[in-house]
Amino acid sequence: VFDTIPAGSGKVTGTGTTQITINPAGSLASDTAYHVTIAASAFDDALSNSYAGISDATTLNFVTLDTIDPTLSSSSPADNATGVGINSNIVLTFSEAVDAESGNIIIKKTTDDSTFESIPVGNSKVSVSSNVVTINPAGTLASSTGYYVIVDATAFDDPSGNSYAGISAKTALNFTTGDSINPALSSSTPTDGATGVALNTNIVLNFSEAVDVETGNIVITRTSDSAVFDTIPVGSGKVTGTGTTQITINPAGSLASDTAYHVTIAASAFDDALSNSYAG
C-alpha cells in the first residue's frame, strides 16, 4: 500500500461538486504500476445515494512515467581489468534497455590520452540488444598497454527518453591489455657468424624479456656433416638463467678446433611469464 487516505481528510477535496481531487502524501515511484480502490461508503449524492466504490485492481489502474536515467551495471572488460585480450570487444551492461542515439564511444591510450579509435554509436561496430551494448573496435589493441573508454552523454537513452550520463572520467572504465608478444633473441655470445670462438665457451642467449625454461632441447651441430655435438635438454643443469633475460648453456665437452657449429633451439624451450613462446 502506497497511501491510505481517509475520504474526510484534507487530502480529498471537491466535496459537493462532480470532481473529487485526491492528493497523496508522497511522490509515486517512477515507472511503477498502481491501482486505486475506493470504499463504497466514501461518496454520496445529495439524496444519500452511495457511489459503489472500487474494490478490484483493474477498474482504476495506471503506470507512472519512467524518470530514471539508465546506469552502467557492469562492463567487460571490468574497470581496472588487466590481461585483457588485444582483440576483445567492449561490452556495456545497463540497468535497463537502452537505444543508441548520437555521439561517440572513444577508446584512448592511458599514457598520453591519444585516441585509439572513435566509434559513432550509430555505427555497425556498436550493437544493442536490450540492456547490453557490444562495441567491436576495428583495430587491434596494443599489447601490455593501458586504455580507457569515454562514452558521450548523448549516446544512449532508455525507451522513455532518459539519457545515460555517459563516461567522461579517465578512471571510470580503464583496463590494461595482456602481453601477447613472443620473446625474441636480442643477442648471443658467440654472435651469429663469429669466428675464433674459444673451445670451452658457454653459449649465452640474451632475450627481449625474461623467459622461463620449459621443455625441449638445445642442439649443437657440426655444420660440415650435420653431426650432433651435444643435445641439451633445457631442463638440465647445463641450462641456467630461467626467470631472467639471459640464458647460459654449458655444453658437456669441448668444441673441436677450427670447426663450424650451429645451434638449434626447440620452439617449446622458453616462454615468458604469460606463456608466450620463443619461436626457437
Model regions and ranges:
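Acidic, Ser/Thr/Gly/Pro-rich low-complexity segments and short DxT(G/T)-type signature motifs
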Residues: 1-5, 28-30, 39-83, 104, ...
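Aromatic sugar-binding surface patches on proteins
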Residues: 14-22, 128-135, 241-249
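Short, surface-exposed alpha-helix to beta-strand junction/turn motifs within ectodomains of secreted
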Residues: 1-12, 41-44, 58, 86-126, ...
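Short intrinsically disordered, low-complexity coil segments enriched in acidic
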Residues: 1-20, 130, 279-280
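Short beta-strand segments enriched for Tyr within beta-sheet-rich domains
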Residues: 34-38, 94, 145-151, 207, ...
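Solvent-exposed, conformationally flexible loop/turn segments
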Residues: 15, 31, 85-87, 144, ...
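Acidic, Ser/Thr
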Residues: 25, 95-97, 138, 208-210, ...
